[in-house]
UniProtKB/Swiss-Prot annotation:
<comment type="subunit">
    <text>Homodimer.</text>
</comment>
<keyword id="KW-0963">Cytoplasm</keyword>
<keyword id="KW-0511">Multifunctional enzyme</keyword>
<keyword id="KW-0444">Lipid biosynthesis</keyword>
<keyword id="KW-0276">Fatty acid metabolism</keyword>
<dbReference type="Pfam" id="PF08545">
    <property type="entry name" value="ACP_syn_III"/>
</dbReference>
<feature type="active site">
    <location>
        <position position="281"/>
    </location>
</feature>
<feature type="active site">
    <location>
        <position position="251"/>
    </location>
</feature>
<keyword id="KW-0012">Acyltransferase</keyword>
<dbReference type="GO" id="GO:0033818">
    <property type="term" value="F:beta-ketoacyl-acyl-carrier-protein synthase III activity"/>
</dbReference>
<comment type="pathway">
    <text>Lipid metabolism; fatty acid biosynthesis.</text>
</comment>
<dbReference type="GO" id="GO:0006633">
    <property type="term" value="P:fatty acid biosynthetic process"/>
</dbReference>
<keyword id="KW-0443">Lipid metabolism</keyword>
<dbReference type="GO" id="GO:0005737">
    <property type="term" value="C:cytoplasm"/>
</dbReference>
<dbReference type="InterPro" id="IPR004655">
    <property type="entry name" value="FabH"/>
</dbReference>
<dbReference type="InterPro" id="IPR013751">
    <property type="entry name" value="ACP_syn_III_N"/>
</dbReference>
<dbReference type="InterPro" id="IPR016039">
    <property type="entry name" value="Thiolase-like"/>
</dbReference>
Length: 324
């Protein structure tokens, strides 16, 4: 018998304000057709004035806890994956910890940009497998609207705000791919490409927040190659084939990246959970947002095999294989 980290509840939160491509076309030199053709995005949610990453994270967390049927006091660990924290410190996770009524255990943030949720899931899984934690709350939450240059049509049209969360609980497994829970996680990074996707600000460099900068074509090329490799790694580690996977929940960066990865790996598009059209790229929040939607509408069912994959600035990339 071995310890597995089982997902027992999912939750998400999207700000109420919707911004369509038509609205952006009135502000910058772009059009609905241009945005849809290059990204597949038609709209995005934007946080209200005064609405912070911790607000989004807390709302998603409370919904995940409700779905799991537990209170915040039962949680031993909170990890928030974010590149847009409320403050330089303390960690956004500590704010969530307080707001959900968790008085023991520990909380911290993970920063791996768009790969952040997969990284955070892997960290929580290892804490559970080590026996230090029984129940963990893993959240991806972002307010990327706060770090966008709204005059730069190459970036401002691509991102949105939101949060998603899952509750993990220790369970017993037999050590096979039939076990429910996280079967494996696979993480990578390559800092030599940091200048292809970055924010030009920070406390120690400019003492400013800065804005997102991206070399889109280069990011696309690396994304398809790296994501295909890390998905293949997850399949090989569990002695599985692409046809064994019930659903793929990819990072929702761009429809073309999702389609390119699916084609390279031989996944039919109807196995790919896609929300990018309505949510845009919500960075670390995108996977748990999409996962929660697919669980909520009944597409993803208990016992099914789900593959999560993401790539972000750094570069960072990773995958997680989960039996729901």
């Amino acid at each position: 018998m071995i310890v597995r980290s089982q997902i027992i509840g999912c939750g998400s939160y999207l700000p109420s304000r919707l911004v369509t491509n038509a609205e952006l076309a009135a502000q910058v030199d772009t059009s609905d057709e241009w945005i849809v053709e290059r990204s597949g995005i038609r709209q995005r949610h934007i946080a209200a004035e005064g609405e912070t990453t911790s607000d989004l994270a807390t709302n998603a967390a409370l919904r995940a806890l409700e779905a799991a049927g537990i209170s915040g006091s039962a949680v031993d660990l909170v990890i928030v994956a974010t590149a847009t924290p409320d403050n330089t410190f303390p960690a956004t996770a500590t704010k969530v910890q307080s707001r959900i009524g968790m008085r023991h255990g520990f909380a911290f943030d993970v920063q791996a940009v768009c790969s952040g949720f997969v990284y955070a899931l892997s960290v929580a899984d290892n804490f559970i497998k080590s026996g230090q934690v029984q129940t963990a709350l893993v959240i991806g939450a972002e307010t990327f609207s706060r770090i966008l240059d709204w005059t730069d049509r190459t970036t401002c049209v691509l991102f949105g705000d939101g949060a998603g969360a899952v509750v993990l609980r220790a369970s017993r497994g037999k050590g096979s791919s039939a076990d429910r829970g996280i079967l494996s996680t696979h993480l990578h990074s390559d800092g030599s490409h940091y200048d292809l996707l970055y924010v030009d600000g920070g406390p120690s460099s400019t003492q400013t927040v800065g804005h997102v900068h991206m070399e889109g074509r280069e990011v696309f090329r690396h994304a398809v190659i790296n994501l295909a490799a890390v998905v293949g790694e997850a399949l090989a580690a569990n002695d599985l084939k692409a046809s064994d996977i019930d659903w793929v929940v990819p990072h929702q960066a761009n429809r073309r990246i999702i389609e390119g990865t699916a084609k390279k790996l031989g996944f039919p598009l109807d196995k790919m959970v896609m929300t990018v059209e309505r949510h845009a790229n919500t960075s670390a929040a995108s996977i748990p947002l999409a996962l929660t939607e697919a669980v909520g509408d009944g597409r993803i069912k208990p016992g099914q095999l789900v593959l999560l994959e993401a790539m972000g600035g750094g570069f960072t990339w990773g995958s997680a294989l989960v039996r729901m």
